[in-house]
């Protein structure tokens, strides 16, 4: 996933248009970049980033032949499961506030 992109899995169910509009507004307003910086800082401060890098390195070394798609399949659920609850809650709060402010403008 490139910087500035949202996973399309969240848009499943026909909400692609709304999803894309939200993503566009997040990027255009600069909120996407602010949230990305906040996420990186919080993950670094919590030690999650270091732990995840160590886990990823171990998993990569365990593969007989290094396969990036296979590694992503293993790492993605681990990343989602180990994301600190306070980080998830804080970012969801920031997104909710952004939506509240921007839905009034729509």
Curated annotation (Swiss-Prot):
It is found in: Nucleus, Nucleoplasm; Cytoplasm, P-body. It holds the Pfam family EnY2. It comes from the Eukaryota. GO terms for molecular function: chromatin binding; transcription coactivator activity. Keywords: Activator, Chromatin regulator, Cytoplasm, mRNA transport, Nucleus, Protein transport, Transcription, Transcription regulation, Translocation, Transport. GO terms for cellular component: DUBm complex; nuclear pore; nucleoplasm; P-body; SAGA complex; transcription export complex 2. PANTHER family: ENHANCER OF YELLOW 2 TRANSCRIPTION FACTOR (PTHR12514). Component of the nuclear pore complex (NPC)-associated TREX-2 complex (transcription and export complex 2), composed of at least SUS1, SAC3, THP1, SEM1, and CDC31. TREX-2 contains 2 SUS1 chains. The TREX-2 complex interacts with the nucleoporin NUP1. Component of the 1.8 MDa SAGA transcription coactivator-HAT complex. SAGA is built of 5 distinct domains with specialized functions. Within the SAGA complex, SUS1, SGF11, SGF73 and UBP8 form an additional subcomplex of SAGA called the DUB module (deubiquitination module). Interacts directly with THP1, SAC3, SGF11, and with the RNA polymerase II. Belongs to the ENY2 family. This is Transcription and mRNA export factor SUS1. It comes from Mycosarcoma maydis (Corn smut fungus).
């Amino acid at each position: 996933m490139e910087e500035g992109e949202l996973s399309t899995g969240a848009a499943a169910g026909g909400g692609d248009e709304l999803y894309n509009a939200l993503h566009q507004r997040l990027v255009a307003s600069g909120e996407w970049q602010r949230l990305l910086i906040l996420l990186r800082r919080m993950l670094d401060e919590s030690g999650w980033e270091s732990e995840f890098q160590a886990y990823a390195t171990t998993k990569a070394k365990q593969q007989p032949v290094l396969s990036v798609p296979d590694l992503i399949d293993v790492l993605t659920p681990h990343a989602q499961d180990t994301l600190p609850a306070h980080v998830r809650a804080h970012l969801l709060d920031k997104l909710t506030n952004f939506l509240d402010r921007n839905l009034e403008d729509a």
